[in-house]
A protein has these predicted regions:
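Short, amphipathic alpha-helical interaction segments embedded in low-complexity terminal/linker regions
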Residues: 1-78, 82-83, 104-108, 113-117
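Right-handed parallel beta-helix
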Residues: 73-85, 94-96, 118-202, 211-220, ...
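Generic detector of contiguous secondary-structure segments
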Residues: 112-125, 190, 251-265
Length: 310
């Protein structure tokens, strides 16, 4: 883009005159995106932006003054009234979901540097769904959204039991602990997934290259995991009904508690190996241990499978 066009674009989006726009671009190395972010921080963008938008309920609280001052951290609270589902779309940075003793929902985001409004998360409540997106959509800030790494923390009341929780990320690492829900869906590209003591009737995880680790999850439910090259580890596997894992080249390890009554395993692979330290009957592709109450289905191309007990 020529300098003249960049000046014109900056003038369209800000309250700057021609010489001011030229000076702003020169100070930012003629990088239009950086200039826009700088002018947004200075409050010279045209129009207004609200990082927290709600249709049915407004945040019950805001970030503490010291957090608002440096611009790196924002905190927002929601009442649980009317919220039946939670959806989070987080592009880059760690995301942590857990319970706490307060009776409100709390969301915290923290950047490695001060965040412009267009880089901050947006929270909306509509038709019973609390939706959190990484940043405002569209325009010149698309590239910045992908490059800005931010940490998200979600705290839910211990008494809350959402009907569904959907978590989506690109390179975000997810940690989910002690959450209760009817259905939890987690999808990521290169991020890692750690779930501990998650109580869900239906647990679905899809990952491309990041590893997935589950510990003591879904005691009364079923779990489905799909991955391409990421490894899958199920520690202290207390899944009640069934677990299915589909992997291309990632290895799969399932560790059952010592008091597990048994399992029925079906393993389909092209070249992957299977190792079991648990006494079983049957063949390499169909094994039975104990009463066979837990159904395990594992499909891989070259990924191996290990089954053990604590």
């Amino acid at each position: 883009m020529e300098h003249a066009e960049m000046i014109e674009r900056l003038m369209e989006k800000t309250t700057l005159g021609e010489e001011e726009a030229r000076s702003a671009l020169e100070q930012n190395g003629w990088n239009l995106l950086d200039a826009l972010i700088a002018e947004e921080r200075a409050g010279r963008l045209k129009g207004k932006s609200n990082s927290y938008r709600t249709d049915e309920a407004a945040p019950a609280g805001k970030a503490a003054e010291e957090h608002e001052a440096d611009g790196r951290q924002d905190v927002v609270w929601f009442s649980t009234d009317g919220i039946e589902r939670i959806e989070i779309d987080w592009v880059n940075g760690n995301a942590d979901v857990a319970l706490w003793d307060d009776d409100r929902i709390m969301l915290t985001e923290e950047g490695k540097r001060p965040l412009a409004k267009a880089e901050k998360m947006c929270c909306t409540v509509r038709n019973g769904t609390l939706k959190v997106v990484y940043s405002e959509s569209g325009g010149f800030f698309h590239k910045a959204r992908l490059l800005t790494e931010k940490r998200l923390t979600l705290r839910l009341p211990r008494t809350m039991h959402p009907g569904a929780i959907t978590l989506t990320g690109v390179s975000a690492d997810w940690t989910v602990k002690d959450v209760r829900t009817d259905k939890l869906r987690l999808k990521t590209v290169s991020g890692n997934c750690t779930l501990e003591r998650v109580d869900a009737e239906c647990l679905e995880i899809a990952a491309t290259s990041g590893w997935t680790a589950l510990r003591a999850c879904s005691e009364d439910g079923s779990t489905a995991i799909k991955t391409v090259s990421g490894s899958v580890r199920c520690f202290d596997c207390r899944i009640g009904r069934q677990i299915s894992v589909h992997s291309v080249s990632g290895d799969v390890a399932i560790e059952l508690p010592a008091d597990a009554p048994g399992f029925a395993l079906r393993f389909e692979t092209v070249s992957g190996d299977v190792q079991s330290s648990v006494p079983t009957t049957g063949t390499r592709s169909q094994m039975v241990c104990g009463d066979g109450s837990l159904a395990i289905q594992v499909n891989t191309v070259s990924g191996g499978l290990t089954v053990a007990k604590l």
